[in-house]
Amino acid sequence: MKTLGEFIVEKQHEFSHATGELTALLSAIKLGAKIIHRDINKAGLVDILGASGAENVQGEVQQKLDLFANEKLKAALRARDIVAGIASEEEDEIVVFEGCEHAKYVVLMDPLDGSSNIDVNVSVGTIFSIYRRVTPVGTPVTEEDFLQPGNRQVAAGYVVYGSSTMLVYTTGCGVHAFTYDPSLGVFCLCQERMRFPEKGNTYSINEGNYIKFPQGVKKYIKYCQEEDKETQRPYTSRYIGSLVADFHRNLLKGGIYLYPSTASHPDGKLRLLYECNPMAFLAEQAGGKASDGKERILDIIPESLHQRRSFFVGNNHMVEDVENFIKAFPDA
């Protein structure tokens, strides 16, 4: 049995900037995940379910667990003195860690993706993305350090809190998964160099919004539902409502996750920096593809911290199919 800590140290030579700091940073995220795992499992007993009464910068009602997870992860990262600052879905602006001007890394995160599912005991997750800062070491970080394209990520991953808790990450040398053993308090390696299956047959989208989707996406959904033995259609529809949970299922079973633009969200709804980019990095490392329907996600130059984007991620052939439909059926 190999633990996450042992695996990271063993693979450190594959990382061109290996100094031990990234290992410590991932260890801090691991600690935060353990704390979140512990308290999610007793959320109904300690009054951290439901809405907090506050809204985040996007105007979304914050769940109590959103704020709880944000504070726990922030504290875990701050305590190690190896992160110069963070950006979070739950923070209006970047958080600069005073006294950590010497640190080389910044972290972007969605502390608890799908938190509205907690009340009904459905899987939720944590998403994180790690970059080397671009401003001089020794100075406070600025927003410039966070507004980098996804192709500059040095590591990314997620934690899915479900029937078991799993941490999945990449440093650009494959995707690896670890299952949490609560009796030992450690994450143990369960899958090394994960890959999307060669063919996917699942599409994950909130079809309740069908009438609001662009024409190309509507046509693709109908394509998925049509019978065709040669392409093994119709495909199966599976939608959990948590990006982490839907992505994780499709990574294991094969499929595509779709979150297109709508009239009310013309730029899409998912956040580019701390949702789309890390999942796109993982997808490509697992042999998949991620796009906004027209452009590779990892090549998009971000313009703002909480920028949104349409998002299509999964098996190569499925993402290419939806891109072709979007191109063939443009909205007037």
Swiss-Prot record:
Alphabetical list of Gene3D superfamilies matching this protein: 3.40.190.80, Fructose-1,6-Bisphosphatase, subunit A, domain 1 (3.30.540.10)
Organism: Klebsiella pneumoniae (strain 342)
Record localization: Cytoplasm
Cofactor detail note: Binds 2 magnesium ions per subunit.
Residues engaged in binding substrate: 113-116, 206, 239, 257-259, 269
Assembly and binders: Homotetramer.
Protein name (Swiss-Prot/TrEMBL): Fructose-1,6-bisphosphatase class 1
Single GO cellular component term: cytosol
Gene Ontology molecular function, alphabetical: fructose 1,6-bisphosphate 1-phosphatase activity; magnesium ion binding
Amino acids binding Mg(2+) 2: 110, 113, 275
Cofactor names: Mg(2+)
Chief location category: cytoplasm
